[in-house]
């Protein structure tokens, strides 16, 4: 079931790709994809390209894919290992979700961080206390690692 679903999503992505995102298999392994997200223009990540690795479990879509950023990013909901704190990748996962929808949710997270559910409390603190400093550091990291 999982391979059939993964193939359908790959076909749908090719036919109707989400804006500012792309994704596809690494080599012949349909369970391992690479994706990219363009930094949203209205965010400190504008101009950056962020790469992600996607691993589908064999029981996908019953279980969520494992997704990690492979590009370093300064964000309260994404840690230095690239782990992403996003409810739909954990307890709010639904088999109705697709990789396309997940990538768009990650894009939204880049625009609207959630400092109240941080993966990196120090960055969340700066985000809440000194937004200018947060945005300056995020822009600096984007230039350094994502351009």
Curated annotation (Swiss-Prot):
Signal peptide: none
Gene Ontology biological process terms from the UniProt entry: protein polyubiquitination
Cited function: E2 ubiquitin-conjugating enzyme that catalyzes the covalent attachment of ubiquitin to other proteins. Mediates the selective degradation of short-lived and abnormal proteins. Mediates ubiquitination of PEX5.
Keyword list, A-Z: ATP-binding, Nucleotide-binding, Transferase, Ubl conjugation pathway
Pathway assigned in UniProt: Protein modification; protein ubiquitination
Homology family: Belongs to the ubiquitin-conjugating enzyme family.
GO MF term set: ATP binding; proteasome binding; ubiquitin conjugating enzyme activity; ubiquitin-protein transferase activity
Keyword ATP-binding carried by entry: yes
EC number: 2.3.2.23
Transmembrane segments: none
PROSITE patterns in UniProt: UBC_1, UBC_2
Protein name listed in UniProt: Ubiquitin-conjugating enzyme E2 4
Domain of life, source organism: Eukaryota
Stored InterPro entries: UBQ-conjugat_E2_core, UBQ-conjugating_AS, UBQ-conjugating_enzyme/RWD
Active site, UniProt feature: 85 (glycyl thioester intermediate)
Catalyzed reactions per annotation: S-ubiquitinyl-[E1 ubiquitin-activating enzyme]-L-cysteine + [E2 ubiquitin-conjugating enzyme]-L-cysteine = [E1 ubiquitin-activating enzyme]-L-cysteine + S-ubiquitinyl-[E2 ubiquitin-conjugating enzyme]-L-cysteine
Organism: Candida albicans (Yeast)
Start and end residues of each UBC core domain: 1-147
Root EC class: transferase
